[in-house]
């Protein structure tokens, strides 16, 4: 499952280059998740750029995408962990050739609220399928993921949770959790 962020980009690159995964065919799926964060517009720019670059690097894969839109209720909104697991489970339930689903979770993705969301998301996923989830970059930091990418891919990701849009550009907010993690890692 490909969000457009650094972790999932690193996951895809590892799946395409690590000999451990050489016997698998890669199906990349991206979800245009329209919610209060408004990341979908920024991701819609970077995702096709990455796919084109991966093809230019000689990699082959299948690509598909889904769309979901949700408004906030009682100050809460649907997290990407829920929609990713919904679509991953659904796709596995209708495509028996899929034997593993890769998620871009990495070493610094840990806190109590994230764990509660992961438990809920896993229930959503397993309602559809018993396909195994794998986490190829789980033991890597953001810096290690970034450094593992070829130069041509290193800045083709969108990780900011709340982009700042103007008529001329889209900029990272510089304040959300992922922006701060990238800054701390010396990436942006």
Located regions from the model:
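Nucleotide-activated chemistry modules centered on ATP-dependent adenylation/adenylyltransferase
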Residues: 1-188
């Amino acid at each position: 499952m490909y969000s457009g962020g650094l972790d999932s980009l690193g996951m895809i690159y590892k799946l395409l280059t690590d000999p451990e995964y050489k016997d698998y065919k890669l199906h990349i799926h991206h979800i245009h998740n329209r919610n209060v964060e408004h990341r979908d517009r920024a991701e819609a720019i970077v995702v096709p750029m990455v796919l084109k670059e991966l093809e230019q690097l000689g990699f082959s894969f299948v690509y598909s995408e889904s769309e979901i839109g949700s408004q906030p209720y009682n100050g809460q909104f649907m997290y990407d962990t829920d929609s990713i697991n919904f679509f991953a489970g659904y796709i596995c339930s209708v495509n028996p050739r899929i034997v593993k689903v890769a998620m871009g979770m990495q070493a610094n993705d840990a806190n109590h609220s994230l764990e509660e969301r992961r438990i809920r998301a896993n229930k959503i996923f397993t309602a559809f399928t018993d396909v195994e989830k794998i986490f190829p970059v789980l033991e890597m930091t953001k810096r290690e993921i970034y450094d593992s990418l070829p130069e041509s891919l290193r800045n083709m990701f969108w990780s900011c949770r709340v982009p700042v849009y103007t008529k001329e550009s889209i900029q990272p907010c510089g304040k959300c959790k992922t922006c701060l993690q990238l800054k701390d890692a010396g990436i942006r």
